[in-house]
């Protein structure tokens, strides 16, 4: 449906674009270095069925981030992407207990879901001076899932 497409693209891609554009404008105007991290998904790198708008939005976000990294590098503004795999949340916890959820878990090499805490260290790397030479990069945090079939 077109309405679903618009909602997903507006939320996942356009929303990130607007925030990153405003952040970069402010940093450039202040002549200040900085770091922008966009949150994509492994579904922006590999696809699966039934979520094509989401896959397109996240793939677009990865490519937008790479282009923005090129545009902003001369201002010492880094732009990177964090691409989580399947992360357990309150919203999806019940699904992972179903047969379908258990089958999906078997395709993750570590045989477990990620936890929100698993994203903290990679995010800190991208935001801090520890990652000062990283720009245009995507860090995938997925228990090896991207190496396997999705």
Name each region found by the language model.
Residues 1-9, 104:
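Substrate-binding pocket helix/loop in short-chain dehydrogenase/reductase
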């Amino acid at each position: 449906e077109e309405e679903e497409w618009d909602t997903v693209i507006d939320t996942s891609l356009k929303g990130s674009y607007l925030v990153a554009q405003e952040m970069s404008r402010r940093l450039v105007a202040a002549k200040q270095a900085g770091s922008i991290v966009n949150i994509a998904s492994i579904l922006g790198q590999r696809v699966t069925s039934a979520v094509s708008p989401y896959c397109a939005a996240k793939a677009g976000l990865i490519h937008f981030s790479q282009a923005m990294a090129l545009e902003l590098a001369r201002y010492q503004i880094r732009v990177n992407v964090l691409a989580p795999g399947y992360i357990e949340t309150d919203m999806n916890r019940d699904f992972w207990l179903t047969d379908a959820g258990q089958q999906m878990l078997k395709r993750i090499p570590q045989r477990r879901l990620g936890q929100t805490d698993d994203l903290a260290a990679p995010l800190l790397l991208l935001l801090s001076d520890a990652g000062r030479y990283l720009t245009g990069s995507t860090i995938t945090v997925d228990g090896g899932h991207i190496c396997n079939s999705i």
